[in-house]
Design a protein with these regions (language model features):
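Amphipathic alpha-helical assembly/interaction segments
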Residues: 1-159
Length: 159
């Protein structure tokens, strides 16, 4: 049974040429035009996936309320909240990367709960695999940001 997308997709932001040209112009970061985390593709994907999981989990059995249902909702929402925290900590690279790592871990945890939901028959294989691959893509985008945080970090202008 193949459940993974195979490769962590994701473009993690803008291309190298755009990063280079923005850096040469002396802008504060490659994301200077973005006002909030809600404008980030990875945040949008994570939020949409968490909402899909919330809707789907409404049909999970009552006996799973405190085990599977609460856990999958919590971890999927935590992906978004950790991205939001990372966004607000862009002045400090270590804190930014730490929060992105937390978000990545929550996405991986969500994938684990998805596997349980599929194996227990609460999710169809098709829907479960689609959601799993969505989180695989989210993880890929987060890994790209973690691997190259500099363009995302706010830098002070030297006058």
């Amino acid at each position: 049974m193949q459940i993974c997308a195979g490769e962590h997709g994701g473009q993690g932001g803008r291309g190298a040429e755009e990063q280079k040209s923005m850096g040469e112009r002396g802008e504060r970061s490659k994301v200077s035009g973005i006002q909030s985390q809600e404008e980030l593709d990875v945040y949008k994907l994570a939020f949409e996936a968490a909402m899909r999981l919330f809707e789907v989990s409404k049909s999970f059995p009552r006996e799973e309320t405190y085990a599977l249902t609460d856990q999958i909702r919590r971890s999927s929402r935590s992906v978004c909240s950790n991205i939001a925290e990372a966004w607000r900590k862009r002045r400090y690279q270590a804190a930014f990367v730490s929060k992105l790592n937390d978000s990545e871990a929550e996405a991986a945890e969500t994938q684990t709960w998805l596997r349980f939901a599929m194996e227990c028959g609460y999710l169809s294989k098709e829907l479960g695999q689609d959601l799993y691959q969505t989180y695989d893509y989210i993880i890929g985008k987060l890994v790209n940001m973690i691997s190259n945080p500099t363009p995302w970090i706010l830098h002070r202008h030297e006058s």
